[in-house]
Amino acid sequence: MDRNVRTTDDVLALMDGLFAPEADRWTTGGASWWDAFYADRSKPVPFFADKPDENLDAYLRQGWIAPGRALELGCGPGRNALHLASLGFDVDAVDLSPAALAWARERAEKAGAGSIRFHLGDAFALTAAEAPLAGPYDLIYDSGCFHHLPPHRRISYLALLERCLAPGGHFALTCFAAGEGGMGSELPDSDLYLTGGLHGGLAYTDDELRHVFSGLTEATETTETEWMEEVELRRMNDEAPESPLFGEPFLWTALFRKAAGQG
């Protein structure tokens, strides 16, 4: 059947297919690439180190985020999930890669953090309405997942935040920064579809992140209410190798809060 597009999900799946299979980092089809990436644990990859993001640590130390129910998107070897669990969060952590989750479970067992629930699969499917991880969550955290999404999947990502984040809850992420000292592709969205690839991940300016996430509104018959507000947006601190925290200045760190009255 060739005329099978009826829904937004059908359109999104169709657009996924505009990218070369080897470019896939966001669906279950990309799991084998991530498995190969995590296969050699001795590689000098900064975020392979078992230490949390410096921005996440700062949010917690400053009291901006209180312990509650947390969802981590693209948890990798589990370093941030472990940190959250150690501070009293009830954690669900998702990743596409069986290899990454095997490593994360080993770390959790060693740390005595057996309460973390690790989930294998596509975060969009796992958090769909009536799915196991539908929320609500007090914190949704993403350290390096968002910048591996093609432009059209921002729609899916925003829908995930809207349905899974609790009123008054926080969303935080780190992602590639455009400009001097940054990392990632700065090609326009339209060119990505022409080339059929994401070129290692997408770089964003601070204003582009604000455009995607802050000032989002929800309209009713009588009013239009902002449902996501910016708390902080800055470059990640450059943490020394001996630091107990992870930090690389080619990344943005961002924290947003969902309005308390929004369901």
Language-model-derived ranges and their functions:
Residues 1-73, 77-133, 149-160, 169-263:
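Class I (Rossmann-like) S-adenosyl-L-methionine-dependent methyltransferase catalytic domain
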Residues 144-148:
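Short catalytic micro-motifs in class I SAM-dependent methyltransferases
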Residues 141:
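A conserved beta-strand element that flanks and buttresses the S-adenosyl-L-methionine
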